[in-house]
């Protein structure tokens, strides 16, 4: 638990000067601090969502890492909750199969049930905490720390 599983390659920025190319899809993009958009690369592009994830993404010393939330068995699929650090408007139906599956997923952290928001607070990236400080303070009633 807490072990780094992999580093994420954020080298492919998507912007006006570097748009998505043929075969590249916006659903494979990740949205970061200050509105930066990156195209996820394999293998992290293939990490699926779960409402009961076994990992999360955190930036440490400038590098985004996939970090284990618990022991992950050999051969077990690595998953994370796409709503952690999320602030989008996308909604989709989830078929993750987890006992606590939320069925309808809103890509924004703030659409999560309050108990799950509170559970995920320690997992939030520093940039997300900074950009969403007011909303997080409102959630906890005392701030994010």
Segments from the language model and where they lie:
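C-terminal SET catalytic tail plus cysteine-rich post-SET Zn-binding segment of SAM-dependent SET-domain
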Residues: 50-145
């Amino acid at each position: 638990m807490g072990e780094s599983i992999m580093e994420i390659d954020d080298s492919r920025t998507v912007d006006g000067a570097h748009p998505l190319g043929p075969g590249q899809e916006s659903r494979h993009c990740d949205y970061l601090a200050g509105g930066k958009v990156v195209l996820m690369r394999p293998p992290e592009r293939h990490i699926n969502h779960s409402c009961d994830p076994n990992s999360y993404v955190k930036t440490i010393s400038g590098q985004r890492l996939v970090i284990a939330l618990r022991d992950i068995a050999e051969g077990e699929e690595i998953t994370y909750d796409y709503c952690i650090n999320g602030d989008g408007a996308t909604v989709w139906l989830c078929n993750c199969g987890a006992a606590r599956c939320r069925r309808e997923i809103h890509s924004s952290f703030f659409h999560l049930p309050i108990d799950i928001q509170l559970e995920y607070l320690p997992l939030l990236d520093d940039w997300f905490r900074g950009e969403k400080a007011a909303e997080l303070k409102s959630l906890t009633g005392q701030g994010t720390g």
